[in-house]
Amino acid sequence: MGQYYKPCQIENKKAIEWIYSHDVQSKWTRDDGKVFMMGEGLKLMEHSYVRNKLMQCVEKLLIPGGDWYKKPIVWAGDYAAPEEGSEDNLFSMSDEERTEGERISFKIQSPKALTLAQSSKYKFVVNHTTKQYVDKSKSPERDGYQIHPLSLLTAEGNGQGGGDFRGRDSKGLIGSWARNIISMEKEIPTGYKELIFNLKE
């Protein structure tokens, strides 16, 4: 079965805020030329691309002044392991069906995205925990698409469901930045080292 994901901002091993990808509506064109609106996909490789609107929504939260700027981030999969001492993983913690007294986290209503022009300026995904950065513009291109490093680097649960990344990951990049302090920047912070992100399917 397919594994669904939610980008989450976490604190003390709990999801504080999250985005539901179906809430991010994009215009699509059918083969007959008719335009329609549809939410972005829930599976990891349905939305993990540069210029994808869900990715641009998370980028907007991670730029200077954004609500998630320099905060710990996880792309939480629903098949990921539960948190220590809990039956819930971060995906199930971010559940709006919980009653108010049980609620741990809150869904961001009507998430806003960077424009394509703005997104292209914030090309550095920065990890302030490891003092590393990735230049998303260098992500390998295939059939006109580039995988966005942010979601794969912070993913938990990959490889356990349909729609997960199935390409080669010889350096163990996937999930290596999960729960780290992340931001999107226009410039490389002084003293930070580049991490080469070369994953492709």
Each predicted region: which residue ranges?
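Short, extreme N-terminal segment that most often corresponds to the first beta-strand
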Residues: M1-Q25
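Low-complexity intrinsically disordered segments
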Residues: G33-E201
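A short, exposed loop/beta-hairpin motif centered on an aromatic-Gly-Thr core
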Residues: I16-D31, F36-L42
